[in-house]
Amino acid sequence: MSENLVASRKRIDYIDLLRVVAIFSVISFHFLYSAIARGRTPNVSFSPFSEWAKYGYLGVELFFMISGFVMVQSARDLTFRQFITKRFFRLYPSYWLALLLIFTIASFGFWKKPGPSAQELYFNLTMFPTAFGQSWLDAAHWFLARQLQFYVAISIVLLLRSGKHLGAIFTWWAVIGCAWYFLGIQTFHIWYLNGFFALITGGAIIGLIREFGFSRFRLIALTASYLWALDSRVSKVNWLNQNRGPGHSALIIGLVITAIYLLMILTLVARIASWPIRGAAFAGTLSYPLYLVHDRMGGLVIAQFGTEGNKYYLYLLVVMMAIAFASVLLKVERIIMSPFTTRSRSAKTL
């Protein structure tokens, strides 16, 4: 393997920085906009920041792009068994610990919102509770079902011993998905041609360009993924206005999606890709448990104790609390899983 190829597969601090941007975008959306709009925190009203926080949900789109970027480089040389093992240890231990923590805290009797049932907990342990007609223990966890869909697709490719073709698969995936979308065939609701996969394939193609260079077809595919992602996200504006509250701007959504693509394309700049950022690796790793624990527990605290007078202090306190819980979860997970994950820990990416 050439030195350039080895260098392109090293962990990139800039990507971890983007993970931090993504997670705090999502947190701002949940606390400053979504919880208020849905009446989960009735004693707290919108703030001047809410108009911008309402677009923080697009941090999930950035996470999807990062997933594609990382996957095309990390999975190609793995066997089916290696991939399943790494993904299992990446997702499930932290998820189970987070569920137990959320269940325990949410079950305390003094919260305004009733705690979850044991049945909800059991089905959530699968990471796809809606398949059994159950709701998510934490509504923010819906993202994980899409991740599992993605991993199932990759595992099938590896099971067929076609990992070396992942680059071509992602490239064609973007082109076919774009055509499928704009021809209106998406009404068949095929999972893997959902708009979220526009972002996954876009991230993967950027990873391919970084590793192997530009080609005409990769540029066409990247453009296709961008157009697919842009229109599929912007077209949700009416749904957003009806279900999350009025005032969503198609222009702002489009600008954010464009910014996400540009931020990912910056990984092609050698100086940025090699930029050492102190603490970035830890912060990037922490983004996953932080995503898992922040929403329901933070919402409970704000609903119970939040007022117009203390809301900004409480937001800061809740974020600090979530970071502390996430740090503890990460340490506990490493202690429990260290006998099993010594070889795979370096592969921790989202």
Q: Model-flagged regions — what are they?
A:
Residues S34-R38, N43-L58, I66, S74, ...:
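Membrane-interface helix-loop-helix regions
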Residues E61, G68, F88, L125, ...:
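Generic structural signal for small/hydrophobic residues in well-ordered secondary structure
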Residues D16, V20-I23, V60, S67, ...:
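Residues within membrane-spanning alpha-helices of integral membrane proteins
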Residues S2-Y14, S28-W52, Q73-D77, R81, ...:
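Alpha-helical transmembrane segments in multi-pass integral membrane proteins
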Residues R11, V21-I27, Y92-F108, A270-S274, ...:
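Hydrophobic alpha-helical membrane-insertion segments
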Residues D138-W142, I185-Y192:
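Surface-exposed cleft-lining segments at the edges of enzyme active sites
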Residues F24, L62, W96, L100-T104, ...:
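Generic alpha-helical transmembrane segments of integral inner-membrane proteins
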Residues L18-I27, L97, I169-I176, L222-Y226:
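Alpha-helical transmembrane segments
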